[in-house]
Amino acid sequence: MNALTAVQNNAVDSGQDYSGFTLIPSAQSPRLLELTFTEQTTKQFLEQVAEWPVQALEYKSFLRFRVGKILDDLCANQLQPLLLKTLLNRAEGALLINAVGIDDVAQADEMVKLATAVAHLIGRSNFDAMSGQYYARFVVKNVDNSDSYLRQPHRVMELHNDGTYVEEITDYVLMMKIDDWEHLDHYFRHPLARRPMRFAAPPSKNVSKDVFHPVFDVDQQGRPVMRYIDQFVQPKDFEEGVWLSELSDAIETSKGILSVPVPVGKFLLINNLFWLHGRDRFTPHPDLRRELMRQRGYFAYATHHYQTHQ
């Protein structure tokens, strides 16, 4: 724990009654909340958005906000403020979201619709160059020959932030809280922490332009935020290379790492600037197939919390 950010009491009010969903602290950490839409809410939402296939959401971006409003209305307009409050709360900033009745791989389109509705209650999802849409779906199989760790099943995908190789700031990711990282102060105060570094993506990301930014910056209250991924940062010299290697080791060996099971149909929604995320290895199996979905974007309802190069 670093001295800059004290963990506040959990903001979840056990006596609070919500309409259309429940909210409890997760078993893994009081920072991570579990939000579950009731069976009735899920059923009514899917019925009311049935007229729009996923393709309609891809082609008409305003419909993404429409389905968000439908979901919020079904929750007596308590959902949107709760999402924003949680994600912008430094002591939390993460939700594991579940909808009763959406739990089968055959419901992939329903999962995209629900995730789209939730994401567009807090902002807007960025264009994903890898898929050519506002979201990406990709498959992890037992054998993989891709050019990044994203689809490789039998190795750990190290902790990282999303959006490091694009120019847009990525506020949220729909998929380790840095305040729980015991080495944060050491690396945040290092002279290289604020040096702009080059981030370059492999061909599969369909992003040809390199971007430059530091690994660390601060939010409006001077607290650390990160934009980091070990695979795409390109050190220019020995000093940067050694520091980045030590930084990676310090993150991956942290005692503050959480392991959060995400069953079919559930998704994580996190503040991308002060949570890192990764993925553990899958157990080898000839028939291994897991399809994953992501959305990442920016908050549209608050002054930006990222202060560049301060």
From Swiss-Prot:
Cofactor list: Fe(2+)
Coiled coil: none
Lineage: Bacteria, Pseudomonadati, Pseudomonadota, Gammaproteobacteria, Enterobacterales
Subunit description: Homotetramer.
GO molecular function: ferrous iron binding; glutarate dioxygenase activity; oxidoreductase activity, acting on paired donors, with incorporation or reduction of molecular oxygen, with 2-oxoglutarate as one donor, and the other dehydrogenated
Biological processes annotated in GO: L-lysine catabolic process
UniProt binding sites for Fe cation: H160, D162, H277
Listed name of the protein: Glutarate 2-hydroxylase
Pathway stated in the Swiss-Prot or TrEMBL entry: Amino-acid degradation
Keyword presence, Zinc-finger: no
Pfam families in UniProt: CsiD
Keywords: Dioxygenase, Iron, Metal-binding, Oxidoreductase
Protein origin, superkingdom: Bacteria
Function, in words: Acts as an alpha-ketoglutarate-dependent dioxygenase catalyzing hydroxylation of glutarate (GA) to L-2-hydroxyglutarate (L2HG). Functions in a L-lysine degradation pathway that proceeds via cadaverine, glutarate and L-2-hydroxyglutarate.
Catalysis: reaction(s): glutarate + 2-oxoglutarate + O2 = (S)-2-hydroxyglutarate + succinate + CO2
Native source organism of the sequence: Shigella flexneri
Record-stated family: Belongs to the glutarate hydroxylase family.
EC number(s) from the headed UniProt entry: 1.14.11.64
Keyword Oxidoreductase: yes
Cofactor note: Binds 1 Fe(2+) ion per subunit.
